[in-house]
Amino acid sequence: MIVQLDPASISFPPAATALHEPNGLLAVGGDLSPGRLIHAYQQGIFPWFSESDPILWWSPNPRAVFFPDQIHTSRSLAKTNRKPNWQMSINCNFAEVVRACADERADKEGTWITEEMIEAYCKLHQLGYAHSVEIWFDNELAGGLYGISVGRAFCGESMFHYKTDASKIALLRFAQYFKKHGGQLIDCQVGNPHLFSLGAVNLHRERFLMKLNIAQQKKMPDTFWQARELPLPGEL
């Protein structure tokens, strides 16, 4: 049975009570207030719904994740990544990254990144919880990703690319940077062939929640999410 959330409370039912079909559906309702969203991600729960739906909350089993030191890099991607034209930045253009992700998904299959979602995540960004990674090619935005920080875990929400391989390079370089500074886990929610080809693995929900709980016992260094251009791969 799906739980209807109490508008006056930010609490959620235990993730283990989520439905088997559709996989991971846990609750409906509530809002996208910063407090509720932060609490959800800390519990391994995330919102995912279309414009015509009520707010739906999920915690699927299994859960797809990346371990930062296990991103798969093909020869061609490694060669592309070495080109000096690429540059990475962090938190330099959050709103544009989110909107680019929304536009890319809308072109393919319709987007769940609605205006309501964009506004909610921009608020989280202003509060220091939501972050973007930008990849530039010859000083033009070429791709990127965004997500939510939960201690030393990063809950990825979406990626986009204007240029071939740009989103892969964003993930690869971010994972290297994240690992070097103590990052432990990159959540990618629900796996697909593309994510698995890059090194994502499925964890049983119970194991994922255990790792998420461990990761959020410590914060990333204070300067980690500071908006800036980041060094070249060999200097990360």
Curated annotation (Swiss-Prot):
InterPro entries, per database record: Acyl_CoA_acyltransferase (IPR016181), Leu/Phe-tRNA_Trfase (IPR004616), Leu/Phe-tRNA_Trfase_C (IPR042203), Leu/Phe-tRNA_Trfase_N (IPR042221)
Reactions mediated catalytically: N-terminal L-lysyl-[protein] + L-leucyl-tRNA(Leu) = N-terminal L-leucyl-L-lysyl-[protein] + tRNA(Leu) + H(+); N-terminal L-arginyl-[protein] + L-leucyl-tRNA(Leu) = N-terminal L-leucyl-L-arginyl-[protein] + tRNA(Leu) + H(+); L-phenylalanyl-tRNA(Phe) + an N-terminal L-alpha-aminoacyl-[protein] = an N-terminal L-phenylalanyl-L-alpha-aminoacyl-[protein] + tRNA(Phe)
Gene Ontology CC: cytoplasm
UniProt entry keywords in alphabetical sequence: Acyltransferase, Cytoplasm, Transferase
GO biological process: protein catabolic process
Chief localization: cytoplasm
EC number(s) per entry: 2.3.2.6
Gene Ontology molecular function, alphabetical: leucyl-tRNA--protein transferase activity
Subcellular location: Cytoplasm
NCBIfam families (alphabetical): aat
Family affiliation: Belongs to the L/F-transferase family.
Entry function: Functions in the N-end rule pathway of protein degradation where it conjugates Leu, Phe and, less efficiently, Met from aminoacyl-tRNAs to the N-termini of proteins containing an N-terminal arginine or lysine.
Name of protein: Leucyl/phenylalanyl-tRNA--protein transferase
